[in-house]
Amino acid sequence: MNRKETRKVKVGNIYVGGDFRVSIQSMTNTDTKDVESTVKQIKELQEAGCDIVRCAVLDMDAACAIKDIVAKINIPLVADIHFDYRLALKAIENGVSAIRINPGNIGSREKVEAVVKACKEKNIPIRIGVNSGSLSKELLTKYGKPTPDALVESALEHVKILEELDFHDIVISMKSSNVETMIESYRIASQKTNYPLHLGVTEAGTPWRGTIKSAIGIGTLLAEGIGDTIRVSLTGDPVEEIKVGKEILKNFGYVKEGIEFISCPTCGRTQIDLINIAKEVEERLSSCKKNIKVAVMGCVVNGPGEAREADIGIAGGKGEGLIFRKGEIIKKVKEEDLVEELIKIIETI
């Protein structure tokens, strides 16, 4: 996959942009002032494969809590700031690796200058995060609604503010809950700037709908070589965002570790409880780091042949199944033992 080369920006120990890998981000949904709960969730996200995590900084108590949170984690933390520049200054002082702001909504130029000065001193980048729901009245009047051109113009207006202050450690996002708007916004921005782009469909929805929208939006852009870091936004446990994000990247070859799982849709030839077997295999292997393809197929007639590219898999028969490797049958097993035998063999690979 050929990606457009962008500027590289360092976020903690992670580089975003350049020729560095596409990273995965998420955001905590805890009360940031609750240090224990926030740290617990951050560690869960990191264990799931998150590279960079963001938390909301709503008030000074939350900004002060950043210090204790940073001391207990080893993953880059981004502070999400709106309106009050003092929250950004306190979060920077307390050790965040980056901040997300829109320079145009935190007040006078002097306030923006104070934030930029603090970021420069700590070598901290700024993500300009434009959303379709937060465009200025002027842009909405000009374009009539949150169009791709409106989102890009908003982002570049904020970029200009930072560039005028000789600040260039910038990441840009232009998110919309409308997938077509989101895709076109990033296409336009990719042509107009070489700052790294943070991809995401905002307010994508519950895991089912949100996964589909995010896969289409993020996936389309990645296929075109656009995007340096991603965040899948889902209503629910943010760990699910990481799982979906990893699968999107895996299907484009950006993530090499972890199981690639394939299974057939079942048909009239299926004579085992394939649906539950597939669910169990996928769940049992969810934390496996091995870079192998595993197939769960419904029948012995076509299973091994159809899954010939799989490293290992099972094909169901009547109350039994075959375990195969690279399309070659290696073992016949009773249905109730299929999953256990498959897992045992995978552990030896």
Curated annotation (Swiss-Prot):
Keywords: 4Fe-4S, Iron, Iron-sulfur, Isoprene biosynthesis, Metal-binding, Oxidoreductase. Pfam families: GcpE. Transmembrane segments: none annotated. The keyword Iron-sulfur applies. GO terms for biological process: isopentenyl diphosphate biosynthetic process, methylerythritol 4-phosphate pathway; terpenoid biosynthetic process. [4Fe-4S] cluster binds at residues 264, 267, 299, 306. It catalyses: (2E)-4-hydroxy-3-methylbut-2-enyl diphosphate + oxidized [flavodoxin] + H2O + 2 H(+) = 2-C-methyl-D-erythritol 2,4-cyclic diphosphate + reduced [flavodoxin]. Pathway: Isoprenoid biosynthesis; isopentenyl diphosphate biosynthesis via DXP pathway; isopentenyl diphosphate from 1-deoxy-D-xylulose 5-phosphate: step 5/6. It comes from the Bacteria. Its cofactor is [4Fe-4S] cluster. SUPFAM superfamilies: Dihydropteroate synthetase-like, Nitrite and sulphite reductase 4Fe-4S domain-like. GO terms for molecular function: 4 iron, 4 sulfur cluster binding; 4-hydroxy-3-methylbut-2-en-1-yl diphosphate synthase activity (ferredoxin); 4-hydroxy-3-methylbut-2-enyl-diphosphate synthase activity (flavodoxin); iron ion binding. InterPro entries: Dihydropteroate_synth-like_sf, IspG_bac, IspG_bac-typ, NO2/SO3_Rdtase_4Fe4S_sf. Its EC number is 1.17.7.3. Binds 1 [4Fe-4S] cluster. Belongs to the IspG family. Converts 2C-methyl-D-erythritol 2,4-cyclodiphosphate (ME-2,4cPP) into 1-hydroxy-2-methyl-2-(E)-butenyl 4-diphosphate. This is 4-hydroxy-3-methylbut-2-en-1-yl diphosphate synthase (flavodoxin). It comes from Clostridium perfringens (strain 13 / Type A).
